[in-house]
């Protein structure tokens, strides 16, 4: 039976007792499976957690083809195949990812609401996050207007509402874009702003501020796309508009 994924119900737990139920490999590296886990695997645009399982450093968390959650560990010898171990999540990394992910949804909704510009792709990274939106042309004042709208939502600290649904009822929610998952689906509502199928959102958005750097950086077309970057919390982004790609 696949691991019970406790992070869906509680994304703020940082320490727990993990029971090892299987030892194996993922992508050729040693890995363990836990009966229940709060470690978040790489999925839904959010990076995997880091931390520790017992004395072993957690290097990665991935979902296998069989839907089992594999915790890739750094081990130089045999791994104990059973037993309970103290587990700890790298909270600084996790919380940063949660902020980045929530901020991306709010900023994407701002582009769509104000400019009718859908998000074509998004990449969340350790240093910065990037969203790519479909716009043929834009000026700095327009970008500032989008940024101001997104920050207004953050400062108002609208209470998130969580909804659980499934494939049969997902159509009842006005999602900004179709979910990438199936089965049991978690939908997060930012009141009067956005509905998204998400992973681990933050409880409060008032401690988050979005800064954008903007410029055409066309990865799929000579001139039709632009990018906006969400920087780390509390940091302003000073950058120049890059030149058009050839």
Where in this protein do the model-derived segments appear?
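A glycine- and charged-residue-rich anion-binding loop/surface
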Residues: 1-246
